[in-house]
Amino acid sequence: MKKRLLTLSFLLVIGSYANTCFAWGKVGHELVAQIAFRLLDDSTQKIVKGYLGNLSIEEAANWMDDERGNSYYNYMRTWHYLDIDKGQNYEPSSERNILTVLHSAITDLRMYKEIRRKEVKRDLLLIFHLVGDLHQPLHTGYAIDKGGNTIEVTSPSVSGNLHSVWDTQIIDAKGINLDSCMAYHNSLNPADVLAFEKINELKWMYQSRSLLDTVYSFQNNFLDQAYLDNNAKVIKRQLVIAGIRLASILKDTFGPKTNG
């Protein structure tokens, strides 16, 4: 019997701090999934949809957040984020966080022909969501403010905690949608797209984390119009890059070259 070296069997995980954020919110996660599917061939789309069963790609992308109210899944609370003190680097550990879970899910999914369909579906649900989470900079942020959740801000058009502003409010206020995201995607240099497609979760995390100075570039807890305008562009870019990378994972696993 083959032993699976990496598995994501749903084991109880004990965490001392559970981040309360919902990266990108419902719309943002839907956009990541929709962008990814626009970049897949019909055959790969069909395979992925087959494993998702009765779930749409939008529902798959939001599943981890939708289940937050279900105590059965409390062990997943720490899987959405990673906290690193400012100026420090990530220290690999056995703890279940966004990096370790995403890496395990991607590795697990590559064995999809050898594992049960429900396990493939589980891996897809994790990957669809966590790729999105990883590209929200505050999910790779600082424990001191709980990824921006404890910082209250105001602005001409949005207000609340900094994390919620980045999750949903700028997306809603600026009307970021699939058409605008695909227009941005189509404007990218093909060489940049190829670079984005390389699967390396650690590099993805550091790229998101490099945006934290931009996230915190305000004074007196006030976000002026320039902040909102500039960071709407950053958010759109992050959503598109997340979609490109989700598509890359799916193509790498289920694409024609893999299966033919």
Where do the language-model regions lie?
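Structured alpha-helical
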Residues: 1
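Sec-dependent N-terminal signal peptides
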Residues: 4-16
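N-terminal, motif-rich segments that launch catalysis or mediate targeting to/interaction with membranes
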Residues: 20-130, 140-260
